[in-house]
Amino acid sequence: MKVRASVRKICDNCRLIRRRGKVMVVCSNPKHKQCQG
């Protein structure tokens, strides 16, 4: 999980979602997981 100021899609499988008020990226590739911190 990468914590970043700006999250963005890295590949086509990445999806932007909101969880508990945080913007997150979930993907089939675990390296692409990000959350906004």
Swiss-Prot record:
Major subcellular location class: plastid
Gene Ontology BP, a term: translation
Tagged with keyword Plastid: yes
Keyword line: Chloroplast, Plastid, Ribonucleoprotein, Ribosomal protein
Localization, UniProt: Plastid, Chloroplast
Highest taxon listed in the record's lineage: Eukaryota
PANTHER family from the UniProt entry: 50S RIBOSOMAL PROTEIN L36, CHLOROPLASTIC, LARGE RIBOSOMAL SUBUNIT PROTEIN BL36C
This protein's name: Large ribosomal subunit protein bL36c
Species name: Spirogyra maxima
Gene name of this polypeptide: rpl36
